[in-house]
């Protein structure tokens, strides 16, 4: 930022995933707000191991760094031995014949992984990208996913559509030499209500079921 301040921020209980607390507590525009700050870094881990690693890096990183965490207890995906460089990502189930890429971060990574399992049962090969570094985003991994899948991407985020993960993905690919983009951007639309986390993810259209439907539709488009 202009002041060249070194500020580390952690935002918890964000997104419809928080459940019963309701929309006044969901902070569905936090990623957009911090992404807009010049030179900022925005991180969104999906499990405890990734969170621990990124917190350590925050302490050693100058500038304005924001880390968004989730409220619920989610399965641990990564070992503590894994590294999570700022500006990186993790690819799950990637292969040379993938038909679609599912991009998520935080809670929606778990939904993307569940969706990939269901798509595999339907005969559709899907890679999953954990975009834990929302800013800077891993542009090269996105470009490679486009090259393999014919630019079929489903981006799912627990955030309003403006300025969050979907915007970061599209901005990264806007000037890239990739096939014509076929992107399904699943994000929270309108004002959520109060309920169980799974109910609210489903109502917002960002659950694994919606990700599967979006991916299947993209795979029908030639």
PLM regions and their residue ranges:
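Thiamine diphosphate
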Residues: 18-19, 68-222
